[in-house]
Amino acid sequence: MKTKLKPILTSLLLACGTAMAQTNDCASLTHQALDLSGFNLTIDYMTSALASDQFIQQLRGRQDSEQFFNAIQPVLKKEFSGEILRRELQNRVAALCNAEQMRQTVEKLQSPFIARMLALEAATNSAEGQAKLQRYINIAQTAPPTDDRMEALEKLDESAGVSDFVTDFQMAMFTGILTGAGAPKEILDQIPLRRREMKAQRQNYVELGMSVTYHGVTRPELLQYAGELSTPPLKGFYSLVRKTFVEIVGERSQAMGRDLKPIIAPPTS
């Protein structure tokens, strides 16, 4: 009997060892991919934007400004800490990853052409880059890129899913906050109906921003980049990361809504 059990135990040990190795590989590879792709830097930029007076004003509505500001600051810090969001995103993506596919993603992100484009995006996401971006977007609004270049930028936006991601992020946040605060169903049901309008409002800004970010990049290169982002392994990686991040934002926004309910919930009588 013991002799018969040995092959079974050996197989189980090998399977456990393989699973542990893949788990460790996925954690390391996911960390690399999130760093190389610039998504961790994007999280830092987003959390900084959430703490801005402009964003808080959007949420405040007709509430007393000082009371709302004092209430929301610690809640934002707790639920939307960049460090916590990066760690949670990495853990969730790593739990869903295929080690070989993630290895291919890391290799692709390190390829010369993709690395060059990512470097341009990283420069834009810096504090200095954001200030420059806003200045040049204002100029681009009065003197927009040529039709051919805008067509290439639209194709890149479609492949990269940037406008969709920005829209989904904002919808998840507002839906989460209102859900947590106990908003009535008829109000929550209106949010998905506004998605097309919300995306249209952001798309022009996103694509003008791209024209600044990729200034000096030729039209064929923009189309090449769009092609890379719309095929494996990058397509699967970015889709997974963005979907997972939007889910995290929705969950944390609900928690934020519950914390803010005493000051943003409508009176019951």
Each language-model region and where it sits:
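N-terminal, post-signal-peptide region of Sec/Tat-exported proteins
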Residues: 44-81
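Acidic/His-rich structured neighborhood in mature extracellular/periplasmic domains
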Residues: 75, 79-155, 159
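A cross-kingdom marker for long, charged
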Residues: 199-200, 204-269
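N-terminal signal peptide c-region/cleavage motif recognized by signal peptidases
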Residues: 16-21
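Extended amphipathic alpha-helical interaction segments
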Residues: 123-215, 219
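Bacterial N-terminal signal peptides that target proteins for export
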Residues: 1-9
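Immediate post-signal-peptide N-terminus of mature secreted/exported proteins
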Residues: 22-56, 142-165
